Amino acid sequence: MSAAGSAPVAAPAAPVPSARPHTVRPVPIDELAAVLTTEDHPFDVDHATAVTGVTLRASDVHPGDLFAALPGARAHGADFAAEALARGVAAVLTDPEGARRLPPDAALPVLVHPRPRAVLGAVAAHVYGDPTADLGVIGITGTSGKTTVAHLVEAGLAAAGRTTGMLGTVGIRIDGRPLPSAFTTPEAPDLQALFAVMREAGVADVVMEVSSHALALGRVAGTRFAVGAFTNLSQDHLDFHNDMDEYFAAKATLFDGRAEHAVVCVDDIWGARLAARVPAAVTVATTGASADWRAADVGTDADGGQHFTALTPDGPVPVRLQLPGSFNVANALVALASLAAVGVPAGLAAERFAEVAVPGRMQRIDVGQPFLAVVDYAHKPAAVAALLDTLRAQVPGRLITVLGCGGDRDRGKRPLMGAAAAQRSDVLVVTDDNPRSERPADIRAAMLAGALDEPGHGELHEIGDRRAAIVAAVDAARPGDAVVVAGKGHETGQEVAGVRHPFDDAVELAAAIRGVITGVLGAAR
């Protein structure tokens, strides 16, 4: 290591599974205008046009679409109206500035709204027939744990024999079938179209991760939630939100009447604060706080998993997880309480939990090496601390951590992540994550500054090349140690200066281990 109203019509053909429903009812433009009309913003549109889809990307316009021309950071969507017209757009939704930018010869109806993004979700939901009225949507929000809770809920719904859709960080699935990854973080029109696709496919319930960005930017507007679930809150996304209070306020909007049921983990002060704002919420706790759902008799299994007893309103339920860490006990309780809210008994759901593994979340890599190797998505200070604390309790030897921070994101968390990792690692290798448009060395320097400020920190190394950093960590490992590669988890690419390069931590870690094993065997021969 180196130191330092009408009959349905067929929608345009698309790949199966489709990102749009196969059939839609043409919606007259005056009907859409009525959806948008308020006392402050009346609409009076006299036009025979009907809409059969919604998009905010001119390049994705299908004939009959409503094109949402929204203002952006670099350009206004209305500047691309000519392309939308060439593709057969039926109508435009935009703001006053967008209306001024439209081609003067654009002979089509234009709906002008002062905040078109705020109403886009409701418009798209109406065009696609209000799909979530027919779906049980379970929305999960929080800084950490959303993906794990989503996978556990999906497993519980499957145990109950219910056809399920899932939207989250690791992708989108309909009854187990993946959809293209480009739709992993859907904008409002894409989201409502996906819900309609799921309804067509016979889906009964949808599990959805709900980010603070999705809430603040109106991406889930027009969505009816059967359950809103809150896991926890810690520092992240302060490049988007001004402070933690604003970050919390964005998360809390999921519980402002959008969800029929609320489930809140009160293990941190933010959860307790949210529960106080939502008196009808079902509460979950693992820390001794008073709650409707609690955990008891938590123990570790020989294979690294764990077990506990869920103390539910209907009595105790035994739970086993292959996922280690106290935070996953909380995640499992949130999942069980959310499932109970939609009629799935905790005992039935818990039977499936032991089978759940989540890509890039405490993912073990085993190719026969005499040390533990783990890939995890931890990319915020609290998550790094929780990950390493969990592994420290399991590992007799040293903790060797490979960690970086993403560029063009919350800069304030970089020294905090460096400190959290340095405090808990015997060896910390600071490397690149997704630098994006930033200078990678600057990101590493911020992390190292935090690490160096941590009293009693372990060995510190800086290796910018992530592949080389992983190889160096593996090369340093001895029997009984643990090598932890954190920050990217399930991701299969690394974003550098506008280019996405193929890179998978799990693949790279396995390859590095095989290389070391082969080298050792070769030397022995």
Q: Model-derived features: where do they sit?
A:
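N-terminal leader/targeting and accessory segments in enzymes
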Residues: 1-122, 296, 324, 358, ...
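Residue-level signal for inorganic ion chemistry
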Residues: 32, 65, 84, 123, ...
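Active-site beta-alpha connecting loops in nucleotide-dependent enzymes
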Residues: 72-75, 358, 384-455, 465-466, ...
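Short glycine-rich anion-binding loops that position phosphate/pyrophosphate groups of nucleotides
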Residues: 72-74, 212-213, 234-236, 268-269, ...
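Short internal beta-strands
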Residues: 86, 90-96, 261-266, 400-403, ...
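Acidic, Mg2+-coordinating active-site environments of NTP-dependent enzymes
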Residues: 98-104, 208, 225-373, 450-451, ...
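Phosphate-binding loop of NTP-binding sites
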Residues: 119-266, 270-279
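Glycine/aspartate-rich loop-and-adjacent alpha/beta segment that forms the canonical ThDP
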Residues: 482-515
